[in-house]
Amino acid sequence: MKHLRAPLQSRVVQWLVSPGASVGANEVVVILEAMKMEHEIRAPSAMRITELLFAPGDVVQDNEVLCLCEPAAAVAALPEDSGHSKAAAQTHDAAPVRADLERLLARAALTQDASRPEAVAKRHTLGLRTARENLADLCDANTFIEYGALAVAAQRSRRSQEDLERHTPADGMVTGIGRVNEQPVVAMAYDATVLAGTQGMRNHQKTDRMLGLALQNKLPVVLFAEGGGGRPGDVDMPIVAGLHVGTFASFARLNGQVPVVGIAAGRCFAGNAALLGCCDVIIATRDSNIGMGGPAMVEGGGLGVFKPEQIGPSSVQQANGVIDVLVDDEAQAVAVARQYLSYFQGPRTDVVAPPENALREVVPQNRLRVYDARDAMQGVADVGSLLHLRSGFGVGIHTALARVGGRPVGLLANNPLHLGGAIDAPAADKAARFMQLCNAHGLPLISLVDTPGFMVGPDTEATAQVRHVSRMFVAAAHLRVPYLSVVMRKGYGLGAMAMTAGGFHSPLFTAAWPTAEFGAMGLEGAVRLGFRKELDAVPDGPQRQALFEELLARQVDNGSAIHMATTLEIDAVIDPAQTRHWLITGLQSAKVAPLSGVASIDTW
């Protein structure tokens, strides 16, 4: 019979059996202490204890016999997974909750919405959701793990611990990691029901922790940014102004490295708005207000007295380009955020192609008739995959994320409904930033061209047009992603070159529809400028107009898509119905070049 031996040098703390007792296999016989930690020594098999060789307090050596035993086959063995004692053989459901766990559960419950019904009801009365409701909707079911849930406001010197636990849960910032579309994402939400969603010292620490994890592990970030900025009431920290806080620099450092999504509902002012402005994309509800200072700051600066809803309403912030996607409510904002992230989570196989022949009808037969270029975007993108960005700003160029043949891409298209498709400063800014966004995150770009060129004239030059439109050339020159161009109708001058990444031979291909026409400048202007002498020689009236029409017809023919293809200035003239085939083949042929250094995306 093998006697029970000590597995290490230790001290006997307690015998759980007496001589003559029978024990089952895996039952605890004695407690030993070593290095201030207690070890349970179990019976290797069913046995009867005949003699205890050491008393409590005695020191035993490694492998020394602790007690004499003899076989006791009739003693039932405890199952291996029975727990640490006979008492633990009870089922987990029946076992009482330990005191330490009970304290944790009670404390954790205070962080949940159920513990604050009045605050939740007030939120719902405003037509808004709580921070936790938004995060639960954003993340796949049961995937969110929360960091820093037990934090409270740094106000212990002026408020009781119980008060802080009940009224400043998570210090007004819910942070963690969850999965969106089955891929990990850092998710953070300011809690507007806690101190108006202001930025406290503890929630800055929590934010910094999550931003570090996002950067280190290359995780996308979603921020619900509602709140009132800095919090002066945190008095536990021995600081004066708090301008050393690293949150803003850490958040900005994510730019171009991971997708960063900002969501605004309700009031988003000051520091909260500064973080929102660093995001790749801003999704905002119609009732939102976004501004670098709320009413108190505006009034304090002697700038007047305003209500919150008068500062940065969505109608202003969408038109000026601050808001990328305007939605009705937070539920729609979350749905858009999930859709936006999906473009950076790889290709899809559940592709539904739009009707091919529909593209043949997009451009009117009358070359002077305007049309909606978004129909062309709809015609090349997989069904249901279009997400337009900044649709209320820079309306001269449409920008959208989409999929073509399952591959995520960025789409640009001139808008003939605005200035005939001419590119003005806002449109150029919008297009250049969109190129940077797609380039940073590896999305190929597809350009649908119909432009008479850059907008000109004294009023236009007053907008710094020269600088703004040149952004398109600079952004395109630094692209590492494939660029594919299709000229639908007008391809004139420098504007057409800017829409084709700097020139018709810069893209992977520049194809044209039969409706396309080309020239170094607008054809009408080219005739008036190049044939001024001939036109002036003819009397003003029907005769001069007839000559003008004749000369214009020659220019249109000379600048036709077919003629351009014969001189190899473009790569092909294609049936519009074959556009998706060309794009899909091109996307399959081209590679995304490795990123050299860190990409950046302008905030504007």
Annotate each predicted stretch with a short phrase:
Residues G83-W604:
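Ligand-binding clefts of soluble mixed alpha/beta catalytic domains
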Residues M1-I31:
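Acidic, low-complexity mobile loops and tails
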Residues L16, S22, E51-F54, V59:
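Exposed loop and linker-edge segments at protein-protein interfaces
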Residues A6-V12, M35, I41-R48, V65:
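Short, solvent-exposed beta-edge and connector elements
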